[in-house]
């Protein structure tokens, strides 16, 4: 029985991410927020809360983006309630997803560690 509940939370997470993605894009246009996208949604087992992870296209404006979404959380939740067929829509908690920034930083570090192939040929030849 618990496995079924887990599958339901996954389905709801996917639906919230899809619907909220469209609402966030509209909020970006309407309220002048920095460009961002919804990268992931985690819903608690009791479906009372949802962590919404967003990625800002301009990392330096990420705090402004998350603050803007937190201010619009109630309005976004009401929009979700109109589109989703749930008795209770989870309370939305917005967080900045820094996984892209961390991945880029790791990629840069790895690139700095590995010498380019052209430099190796010049030294040996």
From Swiss-Prot:
Protein role: One of several proteins that assist in the late maturation steps of the functional core of the 30S ribosomal subunit. Associates with free 30S ribosomal subunits (but not with 30S subunits that are part of 70S ribosomes or polysomes). Required for efficient processing of 16S rRNA. May interact with the 5'-terminal helix region of 16S rRNA.
Family as reported in the entry's similarity comment: Belongs to the RbfA family.
Recorded GO MF terms: ribosomal small subunit binding
GO cellular component: cytosol
Subunit structure: Monomer. Binds 30S ribosomal subunits, but not 50S ribosomal subunits or 70S ribosomes.
SUPFAM superfamilies in the record: Ribosome-binding factor A, RbfA
PANTHER family with a match to the protein in the record: RIBOSOME-BINDING FACTOR A, CHLOROPLASTIC-RELATED
Coiled coil: none
Protein name as it appears in the record: Ribosome-binding factor A
Subcellular location: Cytoplasm
Disulphide connectivity of cysteines: none
Any Gene Ontology biological process: maturation of SSU-rRNA
PROSITE patterns found in the cross-reference section: RBFA (PS01319)
Record-linked InterPro entries: KH_dom-like_a/b, RbfA, RbfA_dom_sf, Ribosome-bd_factorA_CS
Major location category of this protein: cytoplasm
Origin species: Xylella fastidiosa (strain Temecula1 / ATCC 700964)
Alphabetized UniProt keyword annotations: Cytoplasm, Ribosome biogenesis
Keyword Ribosomal protein found: no
């Amino acid at each position: 029985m618990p496995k079924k509940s887990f599958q339901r939370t996954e389905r709801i997470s996917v639906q919230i991410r899809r619907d909220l993605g469209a609402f966030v894009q509209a909020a970006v246009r309407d309220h002048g927020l920095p460009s961002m996208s919804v990268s992931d949604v985690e819903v608690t087992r009791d479906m009372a809360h949802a962590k919404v992870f967003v990625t800002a296209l301009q990392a330096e404006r990420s705090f402004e983006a998350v603050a803007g979404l937190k201010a619009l959380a109630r309005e976004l939740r009401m929009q979700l309630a109109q589109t989703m067929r749930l008795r209770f829509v989870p309370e939305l908690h917005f967080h900045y997803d820094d996984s892209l920034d961390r991945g880029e930083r790791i990629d840069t570090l790895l690139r700095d560690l590995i010498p380019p192939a052209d430099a190796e040929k010049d030294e040996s030849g």
